[in-house]
Amino acid sequence: MDVTKNKHDIVHRIGFLPQGFSSFDRITVRETLQYYSRLFSGMKSDVDGLIELVNLKDKAKEQYKNLSGGLRQRLGIAIALVNNPEVVFLDEPTTGLDPRARREVWEVLQGLKKKGKTVILTTHYMEEAELLADTVAIISKGEIIAMGPPGELIKNNTNYLVLTLQSGDESVFGVVHKMGFEPVLSNHKDIKVRVEHTDDVLKILNAIRDAGALYRGLDVRNPNLEEVFLKMTGEALLVDSVGGKGKE
């Protein structure tokens, strides 16, 4: 469909929640949805249904100014749905929310999927993309560099394990760095390195023991979407590295 020639049809077929969404302070959740629904002529929105969909039934009479960040985002999603769109665009809908509020928004988005809505979501949280998305597009410098189901992206772009060492001992980083393993993340608390085999884990642990260094705990797991993103974009999460910068 030509967007320039069919603007009216497009507006009625899509919904959009911008990043940094805000609304009118002194009107209630119900009044807010009623207001936005009136912007679409010839349509009658199911306001009660939208309130229930985003789990705001007990907040329907609450003014916008009294809502928490998570509740505001859920209201924003409801606003994006007032015209019953075929496709919903959500720009960073969980940015700045605490973990509990983020998960509440995730539940709403999963509910949209169950209702058959097509949701296009932008996010910097790879955990969020891995959990919610059927298809992920990784964008770097304005270009799509990879696209596919999260599981396939991980499987096709990784052939290693991730070892996490919980350590307050700065000498642990020096041991790992000297052995030449590729770091994923390093700070004063955790060291994450990529290893090809479980035998490499034993080599690292033995080297740490021989050096007299200490660690509090360890974890070995398969890579996740965040590691794929870092690998494919060439970006790193190395911060406060001890003994020099890690590889990027």
Residue positions per predicted region:
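ABC ATPase NBD Q-loop/coupling interface
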Residues: M1-D9
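Conserved ABC ATPase "signature" region
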Residues: Q34, R38, K44-K59
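Conserved ABC ATPase signature
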Residues: Q63-G70
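Hydrophobic anchor residue at the start of the ABC signature
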Residues: I77
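Conserved catalytic motifs of ABC-family nucleotide-binding domains
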Residues: N84
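Catalytic Walker B motif of ABC-type/P-loop ATPase nucleotide-binding domains
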Residues: V88-D91
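ABC transporter nucleotide-binding domain
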Residues: W106-V195
